[in-house]
Curated annotation (Swiss-Prot):
Membrane topology annotation: Multi-pass membrane protein
Gene: SLC39A1
Family: Belongs to the ZIP transporter (TC 2.A.5) family.
Name of the protein in its database record: Zinc transporter ZIP1
GO molecular-function terms, A-Z: zinc ion transmembrane transporter activity
């Protein structure tokens, strides 16, 4: 109604509607984001391999490089801790709550936390089965009959022996290789889901914001992942292969999201959330029982390691805050 009680004429103005409606997400924008994410993440994954895997000229240079790698790995540990607590967990909890609300499901049972626990126990059971099988293959030496977390009577200095360095019995290298695989898998799966968020996006402005945030986030994570794998004494070829795999996951998610944009529904979202919850549970295990204990177990440069750990946490925290 008009100001004098007269009915107003409803006139459709195309220019006004176009200014209020979100700009549709074009296929070329998604393809550009896909290629850019692939190239940048791949470069960030391979740079640590090229820089830190050069053969040392003498034992002193090799020892110095190992100390530097340990310090940088503490920084990466802070990045992983922030990724676990401030990125993976909130994304998973928000997505599964949204999916359950869309399906009009009300739960009395803590399903979200149960899925996290299942992901946690999945890695634990796999590691224990692998370790038990390796121990039954032959009597391990006395120094290898230690707990899975690397704490023995001999002190914490034996921790790094279990990070992929070949041993006589081979019992300690198997859990380390498994943990490395689980770490890559959990990050790769989460990257697919982050790519899905871009691929399913129909608002171009929002999609560009997501792509920019992912570029920064994935670049930092790619460097941290390569440092983590190098610290596990894996071969450079294996680390490079894991970096390539990780680099392809977010573009894969963008492609899948683009293809499924028209058919995405609450059931699809619920299934995706369950998988993401399992991945978050595995990442919880790797973060708190592998990455942080290993870096803080040795007695060298404790204060500097804590500072670098906090710096890595603060860096990703600031990045996530900027996204808000």
């Amino acid at each position: 109604m008009g100001p004098w009680g007269e009915p107003e004429l409803l006139v459709w103005r195309p220019e006004a509607a176009a200014s209020e409606a979100p700009v549709p997400m074009g296929l070329e924008v998604k393809l550009g984001a896909l290629v850019l994410l692939l190239v940048l993440t791949l470069i960030c994954s391979l740079v640590p391999v090229c820089v830190l895997r050069r053969p040392g000229a003498n034992p002193e240079a090799s020892a110095s490089r190992q100390k530097a790698l340990s310090l940088v790995s503490c920084f990466a540990g802070g990045v992983f801790l922030a990724t676990c607590l401030l990125d993976l967990l909130p994304d998973y909890l928000g997505a599964i709550d949204e999916a359950l609300a869309a399906l009009h499901v009300t739960l009395q049972f803590p399903l979200q936390e149960f899925i996290l626990a299942m992901g946690f126990f999945l890695v634990l059971v796999m590691e224990q089965i692998t370790l038990a099988y390796k121990e039954q293959s032959g009597p391990p030496p006395r120094e290898e009959t230690r707990a899975l977390l690397g704490t023995v009577n001999g002190g914490p200095q034996h921790w790094h022996d279990g990070l992929g360095v070949p041993q006589a019995g081979g019992a300690s290298s198997a859990p380390s290789a498994l943990r490395a695989c689980v770490l890559v898998f959990s990050l790769a799966l989460h990257s697919v889901f982050e790519g899905l968020a871009v691929g399913l996006q129909r608002d171009q402005a929002r999609a560009m914001e997501l792509c920019l945030a992912l570029l920064l986030h994935k670049g930092i994570l790619a460097v941290s992942l390569s440092l983590r794998l190098l610290q596990s004494h894996l071969r450079a070829q294996v680390v490079a292969g894991c970096g390539i795999l990780f680099s392809c996951m977010t573009p894969l998610g963008i492609g899948l999201g683009t293809a499924l944009a028209e058919s995405a529904g609450p059931l699809h979202q619920l299934a995706q959330s369950v998988l993401e919850g399992m991945a978050a549970g595995t990442f919880l295990y790797i973060t708190f029982l592998e990455i942080l204990p290993q870096e803080l177990a040795t007695s060298e440069q404790r204060i500097l390691k804590v500072i670098l750990l906090l710096a890595g946490f603060a860096l990703l925290t600031g990045l996530l805050f900027i996204q808000i």
